[in-house]
Amino acid sequence: MKRTPTKVAKAQALTDGAALNTGLVVGSHGRHCVVETADGQRVICHPRGKKSQSVVGDRVRWQAATDEGTIEQVETRRNLFYRQDEIRTKSFAANLDQVLILIAAEPEFSETQLTRALIAAEAEQIRPIIALNKSDLGALFEASWQRLAPYRAMGYTVIPLSLKQAQQQLDHPDTNHPVSSLAQEGQAQLLALLSGQTTLVLGPSGSGKSTLINALVPGAQVVTGEISQALNSGKHTTTTTTWYWVDRIASATAQRTALIDSPGFQEFGLHHIAPAQLAQLMPDIKAHAQECRFYNCTHLHEPGCGVLAQVESESTPGAISARRHRIYQQLFEELGQQRW
């Protein structure tokens, strides 16, 4: 029987308060979170101390109290995803199988923001997927698709989508809404990649992220609203990182399909990464970093730099684009700045 998560329940109704319970963190705001139990009930919890602070996707051990639970232990994580503003690095999702970076042909996406997200995924050895929405826009989409050519050459999975057409099909299944073969192929590929996986969905405003989640998770707005209300985060539900079960996508394994929706794509930072690590997290730079004369080459100005040699011969197949190297330079300088 399909398990349907219930509304947030009082902790004391779930246990006698003596033994530790296990659960999954499905919502987080500030120091409080919502933990889902094995039978689908949801409990408001807070951490016992800094070592028990949790993020969405964490498996935790918690103890019931009078009105809410206390997280006593966070189980060992497979990985941890970070975001950052100008001052602070903050973890916000754990135990991911992959990251879906959703961008669009219109408004024009930021290649720097895309690169930041890819680097963050590479740093935690999380598989990234790039999806370019609005394939129905013709020439605008084609231009954006060409901008992503270097990323396809690096081996990243890049999928074309038309979420507008997909949504029309879902809303009006009895009406003929033509969907291009390109969009159909991309949609089928995306559903196959999501099946049985835990996927963090990232994307700037206008990319279609809400459309995607609402299409895959009927009632997603209701779930988000309940979690936000329980966590006292008010009406601004976009500030809350939320876990969704996606029962619409069948899984060939015992693992259910899940999406994690989180805001703040514009705030993506990398200050938890040292400048010297950067080249190893950008596949096109990494491919030529071993060709440098000096072992500690920064790939910015040194003589005999294998990376710079490839930038200078940009017309050569497999070479590094000048645009990508500018992004590397900007990030290297940013990560080298002193942080207080």
Task: For each feature predicted by the language model, list its residue ranges.
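Helix-rich effector regions associated with P-loop NTPase G domains
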Residues: 16-19, 56-59, 64-68, 75-99, ...
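N-terminal accessory targeting/assembly segments
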Residues: 1-111
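Phosphate-binding glycine-rich loops and their immediate beta-loop-alpha structural context
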Residues: 104-156
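Walker A/P-loop
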Residues: 205, 210-211, 215
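Canonical P-loop GTPase G-domain recognition
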Residues: 137-207
